[in-house]
């Protein structure tokens, strides 16, 4: 029996504020690092007191907190890890994310109350490894980012139901295998395996001829230069049905070093998408009431349906269903198949040739799917033998636009679709940003038809179109009227033009505290968020 009754949206946090923001915007769980032994040293990270407060805040709202404990320790760090773990176990957090087997066994001894989640750093790429970690006490594996959907499905079909599968769905990708990289350490002495990555893969490089030392020849692909090792970002928002249908139980958003706005916007987007999945798949009604138990749609060995085709009516009625990943299990034709297991090979039935189609690109999807995946379908009469066909989960336009409203590099769908893998993004390394945060809500009052008090971040002027990012809903779009700005002392001002100052302005709709206010930039930039 599966442990979860709903897919988990797992959000990042680099500090206590980020943790609370993630919970406020719908995260089922938040992962964050302490002051030591996590894979991100750039963010402020959380103290033991922060973990106590954060865990209490999350639990009161039905969410969980996971702590990254996934460095690859050296001998001189082992006892310090043991001591830190002894303190961490009493803070109320729910799980540890580990990558080292020794640390995993230490955690079982020192902190048996904490769940163990195996980090992507461990490089789990097959069901044998997943089962081995399960036997060692893990209750979740974070699969290597290099896995395609069929590999996820095959692992899900061959591991215990109470072993969670966590998969990355959004954010930065690494040019090294699941983040295990020596590049930064080699060039700068900053150890990426201890959270200190200098990201030299994002740098621009020049060529130096052996006999002309000191003469640098730039490598230029565009006016921006050339970035030889730079990878695209991941964006699976329009494809989460494929991932959940493949057996993932937790959807992980990358970004512990990102802003509170990024955390809010992306957590809200993926939570809304999961809610749509649950309703459109018939697991819940629109009010969140359970209609039937949630389970993945993977067909396991031993299942009566394993390897058997559905009827033609059932298949063709759902012709844009979840055909994701080049199958290890053969595709099978709709009709004319003898009883029992049939290996797709050189048999034919009627006018249908039974054999692997020449081009399994596995998608007939809405044109609103934004990434580098193909919009193709299996040849007529075929369906994937390893997954039950179902209609594609449709998402509203506003939701599909959300990933473009945070700072990002060129998007891809990672390695999930074999024919359309993540690529180098060699023409630029900086983030693209078409929207910027102009303020954060401090309070709202019904005074004078509604007024919002904000902490300013960027200029707001009369006639400007802004959006309030709302938890569990589409953003509230609003054109700022003239003549309504006041400063903190109540004096009327023509515009909000001083960052980090308190102002108020008209706002007819009630908006929650800490909601981000964003606006289109007048000129899209490549400035990092």
Language-model segments: what does each one mean?
Residues 1-24, 29-31, 36, 55, ...:
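Surface-exposed amphipathic alpha-helical tracts and adjacent flexible/coil segments at the periphery
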Residues 40-59:
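Glycine-rich, positively charged N-terminal anion/phosphate-binding segment
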Residues 43-48, 76-85:
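Glycine-rich loop at the start of a catalytic domain that most often binds anionic cofactors/ligands
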Residues 52, 65-68, 81-84, 98-99:
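Phosphodiester-processing cores and adjacent nucleic acid-binding clamps
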Residues 79, 118-125:
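Gly/Gly-Pro- and Ser/Thr-rich, intrinsically disordered tail segments characteristic of DNA damage-repair
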Residues 102-103:
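Alpha-helix capping/helix-boundary segments
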Residues 111:
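Conserved phosphotransfer cores of two-component systems
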């Amino acid at each position: 029996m599966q442990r979860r009754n709903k897919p988990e949206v797992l959000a990042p946090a680099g500090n206590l504020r980020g943790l609370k923001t993630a919970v406020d915007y719908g995260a089922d769980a938040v992962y964050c690092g302490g002051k030591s032994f996590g894979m991100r040293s750039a963010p402020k990270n959380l103290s033991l007191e922060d973990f106590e407060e954060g865990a209490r805040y999350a639990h009161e709202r039905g969410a969980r907190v996971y702590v990254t404990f996934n460095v690859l320790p050296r001998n001189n760090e082992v006892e310090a890890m043991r001591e830190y773990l002894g303190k961490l176990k009493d803070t109320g957090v729910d799980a540890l994310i580990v990558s080292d087997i020794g640390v995993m066994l230490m955690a079982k001894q020192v902190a048996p109350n904490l769940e163990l989640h195996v980090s992507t750093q461990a490089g789990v790429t097959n069901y044998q490894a997943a089962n081995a970690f399960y036997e060692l006490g893990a209750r979740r594996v974070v699969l290597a980012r290099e896995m395609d959907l069929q590999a996820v499905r095959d692992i899900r079909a061959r591991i215990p139901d109470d072993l969670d599968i966590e998969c990355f769905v959004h954010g930065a990708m690494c040019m090294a295998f699941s983040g295990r990289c020596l590049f930064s350490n080699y060039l700068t002495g900053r150890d990426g395996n201890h959270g200190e990555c200098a990201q030299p893969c994002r740098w621009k490089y020049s060529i130096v001829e052996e006999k002309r030392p000191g003469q640098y020849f730039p490598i230029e692909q565009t006016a921006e230069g050339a970035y030889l090792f730079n990878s695209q970002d991941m964006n699976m928002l329009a494809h989460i049905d494929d991932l959940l249908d493949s057996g993932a139980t937790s959807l992980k958003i990358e970004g512990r070093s990102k802003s509170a706005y990024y955390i809010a916007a992306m957590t809200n987007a993926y939570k809304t998408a999961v809610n749509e999945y649950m309703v459109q798949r018939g697991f819940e009604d629109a009010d969140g009431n359970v209609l039937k138990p949630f389970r993945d749609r993977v067909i396991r060995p031993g299942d009566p349906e394993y390897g058997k085709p559905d009827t033609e009516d059932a298949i063709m009625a759902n012709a844009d269903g979840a055909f994701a990943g080049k199958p290890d299990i053969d595709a099978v034709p709709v009709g004319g198949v003898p009883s029992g297991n049939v290996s797709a090979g050189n048999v034919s039935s009627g006018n249908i040739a039974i054999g692997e189609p020449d081009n399994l690109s596995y998608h007939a999807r809405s044109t609103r799917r934004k990434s580098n995946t193909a919009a193709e379908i299996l040849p007529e009469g075929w369906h994937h033998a390893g997954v039950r066909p179902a209609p594609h989960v449709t998402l509203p336009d506003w939701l599909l636009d959300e990933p473009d409203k945070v700072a990002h590099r060129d998007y891809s769908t990672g390695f999930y679709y074999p024919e359309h893998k993540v690529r180098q993004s060699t023409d630029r390394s900086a983030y693209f940003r078409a929207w910027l945060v102009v303020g954060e809500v401090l309070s709202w009052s019904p005074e004078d038809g509604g007024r919002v008090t904000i902490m300013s971040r960027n200029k707001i002027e009369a006639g400007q179109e802004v959006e309030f990012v709302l938890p569990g809903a589409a953003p509230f779009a609003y054109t700022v009227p003239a003549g309504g700005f006041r400063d903190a002392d109540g004096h009327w001002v023509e515009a909000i033009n001083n960052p980090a100052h308190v102002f108020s302005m008209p706002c007819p709709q009630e908006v929650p505290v800490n909601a981000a206010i964003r606006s289109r930039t007048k000129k899209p930039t490549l400035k990092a968020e």
